[in-house]
Amino acid sequence: MTKLNLERTALVLVDMQNDFLHPEGAYGRNGQACDAIAQLPERLAPLAKAMRAAGGWIVSTHFTLVPSKKGAPFISPHLRSLRPFLGAGDFASGSFGHQLIDSLQPADLTVEKIAFSAFYQSRLEWVLSRAGLETLVFGGIVTNGGVASTVRDAHVRDFHNIVLSD
């Protein structure tokens, strides 16, 4: 088994945001909360704590809805059909809902994302490279969506990737 150089390793938390997970977030307010997903932060918290203690990094990627000049967010037709309850203020940069859930804070690096992959049209690759990170340990919600898309994009960028399971 290969030992990880934790100073070059990051726990990448995908979409672990209040709007997805907190009862007062967008999903909770609209009756879309999921008990299995709500339990995920408490399962990830010990790993995040251990990573910090061992000198590893915590990177948080945040799904972001960009508001139009009238305040309503730009939402793709596909997402609008799946999540018609999303509206102004949901997943807005700087808002309570956009933040990393308290039990996993603080993150060393935070990157906004507008698509499933956190690499798509974001600064993620740049900050990971500048931080000297080589190995990425992924955990988050919707493994077959944001997590898988980001892992695939990390792979083609030559990062060593580990996907957590429970």
Model segments located where?
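Active-site acidic carboxylates
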Residues: 1-106
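A generic structural signal for well-ordered alpha-helical segments
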Residues: 51-52, 128, 154
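Short Gly/Thr/Asp-enriched flexible loops that form oxyanion-binding sites at enzyme active sites
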Residues: 147-157
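Internal catalytic-core helix/loop-beta-alpha segment
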Residues: 90-140
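Hydrophobic/aromatic beta-strand patches that form the interior of the parallel beta-sheet core
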Residues: 12, 59-61, 109-111, 137, ...
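Glycine-centered short loops/turns at secondary-structure junctions
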Residues: 53-55, 132, 158
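Glycine-rich phosphate-binding loop at the start of an alpha helix
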Residues: 122, 144, 148
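A short glycine-rich beta-strand->turn/loop micro-motif centered on a GG-aromatic cluster
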Residues: 137-140, 158-166
